[in-house]
């Protein structure tokens, strides 16, 4: 059993002001517990999991999570209403508090499976998928989408897509990555950077449809920018910034709750009970420490902290003492800075 650090602000709620985007190869269960330590009120999302994998795959590996992660949402991939409904029902049985349908991933592999961003061209099908899931679960069923695909420059088409989706589910929530998705010519990484951001479209959507809960994603790299967006929309979803500089999650969470900031080292040490349980279960440290690399981003000693974890984490016998070794470098730097 995974120990619980602090459940005071846990539980399933309708607060979508801060969330962490579903990111393939990043937001696994170990990353999500770390993010929960940093941001007690944030909504967390899994990596995308295809509906067929949920139905036929290793559910413990794909769906297992610690109770402290709540509220946590499962992001599903797929385009077959019946399969998505079956997968959603399984996910709710596993305790997920939200089901999110991926309509934004532009990768070739996802396109070959006829889901992800290409679904934005089929709003009626997306509505059928959402309705099928909403009919069999009691938790919110939401969608994460782009503004359009390829050279679409039609706000009306985007708004129509949202209308189709929102009418299919009682949750009335949409997550929008404020860029188009290019289905040819760009890699997934380039698709997160090259298509221009159009925050004005997302603001307009919220202004014209005030009954919708609109969450904005894309290009948010600071707490200040996120708070500015919250003047216009209901929530912000952080992606790469939350992984590359995870302390931003703590800063944002504290800004929303008017709580004092805690030192990075204190937050990291709060993760120790979880790490020790995972190690006892046979996990190697390298699967965990890769999510910690950015915690001291831009801080004195931050680069060496990462190097120690990277190199030492490869050892099969590495344990929490490696993290303490890396932290000692940071604390030595802080002591030196205080003296001089």
UniProtKB/Swiss-Prot annotation:
UniProt-annotated catalytic positions: 105 (proton donor)
Keyword flag Cell membrane: no
Site for Interacts with tRNA, residues: 102, 189, 192, 303, 306
A family per Pfam: Dus
Catalytic activity, as annotated: 5,6-dihydrouridine(20) in tRNA + NADP(+) = uridine(20) in tRNA + NADPH + H(+); 5,6-dihydrouridine(20) in tRNA + NAD(+) = uridine(20) in tRNA + NADH + H(+); 5,6-dihydrouridine(20a) in tRNA + NADP(+) = uridine(20a) in tRNA + NADPH + H(+); 5,6-dihydrouridine(20a) in tRNA + NAD(+) = uridine(20a) in tRNA + NADH + H(+)
Documented EC number(s): 1.3.1.-, 1.3.1.91
CDD domains: DUS_like_FMN
InterPro entries linked: Aldolase_TIM, DUS-like_FMN-bd, DUS_fam, DusA, tRNA_hU_synthase_CS
The entry's keywords: Flavoprotein, FMN, NADP, Oxidoreductase, RNA-binding, tRNA processing, tRNA-binding
MF annotations from Gene Ontology: flavin adenine dinucleotide binding; FMN binding; tRNA binding; tRNA-dihydrouridine20 synthase activity; tRNA-dihydrouridine20a synthase activity
Cofactor dependence: FMN
Classification via SUPFAM superfamilies: FMN-linked oxidoreductases
Positions contributing to FMN binding: 22-24, 75, 144, 177, 217-219, 239-240
Role noted for this protein: Catalyzes the synthesis of 5,6-dihydrouridine (D), a modified base found in the D-loop of most tRNAs, via the reduction of the C5-C6 double bond in target uridines. Specifically modifies U20 and U20a in tRNAs.
Similarity remark: Belongs to the Dus family. DusA subfamily.
Family annotation (HAMAP family): DusA_subfam (MF_02041)
Protein name: tRNA-dihydrouridine(20/20a) synthase
Native species: Xylella fastidiosa (strain 9a5c)
Gene label: dusA
């Amino acid at each position: 059993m995974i120990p619980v650090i602090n459940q005071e602000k846990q539980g399933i709620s309708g607060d979508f002001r801060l969330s962490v985007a579903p990111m393939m190869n990043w937001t696994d269960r170990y990353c999500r517990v770390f993010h929960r330590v940093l941001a007690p009120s944030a909504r967390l999302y899994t990596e995308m999991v295809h509906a067929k994998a949920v139905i036929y795959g290793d559910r413990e590996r794909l769906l297992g999570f610690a109770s402290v992660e709540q509220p946590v949402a499962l992001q599903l991939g797929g385009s077959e209403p019946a399969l998505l409904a079956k997968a959603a029902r399984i996910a709710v049985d596993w305790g997920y508090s939200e089901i999110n349908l991926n309509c934004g991933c532009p990768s070739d592999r996802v396109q070959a499976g006829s889901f992800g961003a290409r679904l934005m061209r089929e709003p009626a099908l997306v509505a059928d998928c959402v309705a099928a899931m909403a009919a069999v679960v009691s938790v919110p069923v939401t969608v994460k989408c782009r503004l359009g695909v390829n050279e679409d420059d039609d706000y009306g088409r985007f708004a129509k897509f949202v209308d189709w989706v929102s009418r299919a589910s009682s949750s009335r929530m949409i997550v929008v990555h404020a860029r188009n998705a290019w289905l040819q010519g760009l890699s997934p990484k380039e698709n997160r950077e090259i298509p221009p951001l159009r925050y004005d479209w997302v603001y307009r959507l919220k202004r014209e449809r005030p009954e919708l809960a609109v969450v904005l994603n894309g290009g948010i790299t600071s707490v200040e920018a996120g708070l500015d967006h919250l003047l216009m929309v209901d929530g912000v979803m952080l992606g790469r910034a939350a992984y590359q500089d995870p302390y931003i999650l703590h800063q944002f969470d504290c800004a929303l709750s008017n709580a004092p900031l805690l030192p990075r080292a204190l937050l990291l040490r709060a993760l120790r009970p979880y790490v020790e349980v995972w190690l006892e279960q046979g996990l190697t440290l390298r699967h965990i420490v890769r999510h910690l690399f950015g915690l001291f981003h831009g801080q004195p000693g931050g680069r060496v902290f990462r190097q120690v974890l990277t190199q030492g984490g490869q050892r099969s016998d590495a344990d929490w003492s490696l993290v303490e070794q890396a932290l000692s470098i940071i604390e030595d730097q802080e002591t030196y800075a205080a003296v001089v």
